Amino acid sequence: MSVIYNKDPRDVIIRPVVSEKSYGLIDEGKYTFQVDPSANKTEIKYAIEHIFGVKVASVNTLNRPGKRKRTRFGWGQRKATKRAVVSLREGSIDIFGGPLS
């Protein structure tokens, strides 16, 4: 059965997550990305495979609620985000690629 994707893969993956925890997961072959909140696991898998040219073993997602922040007009709210932890079958992704300065 063929699946048709309406979203461009580059619209699904927003950016890689840079944190201590995500760096630790890279050694296990797991990469963390911030993704479009409306994207599902199948769309995330398709996007990773087409952007980076690797095979994905599994995708775990988590929704992070926005933090409550104080503004000069009272209390505000940051927007909620969605993250995906992608496990690869083989290969690796050069997320922080480019020449070093």
UniProtKB/Swiss-Prot annotation:
InterPro entries: Nucleotide-bd_a/b_plait_sf, Ribosomal_uL23-like, Ribosomal_uL23/eL15/eS24_sf
Residues in the signal sequence: none
One Gene Ontology biological process: translation
Record-level Gene Ontology MF annotations: rRNA binding; structural constituent of ribosome
Pfam families, per the entry: Ribosomal_L23
Stated role: One of the early assembly proteins it binds 23S rRNA. One of the proteins that surrounds the polypeptide exit tunnel on the outside of the ribosome. Forms the main docking site for trigger factor binding to the ribosome.
HAMAP family linked: Ribosomal_uL23_B
Protein name: Large ribosomal subunit protein uL23
Source organism: Kocuria rhizophila (strain ATCC 9341 / DSM 348 / NBRC 103217 / DC2201)
Lineage of source species: Bacteria, Bacillati, Actinomycetota, Actinomycetes, Micrococcales
Name of the gene this protein is made from: rplW
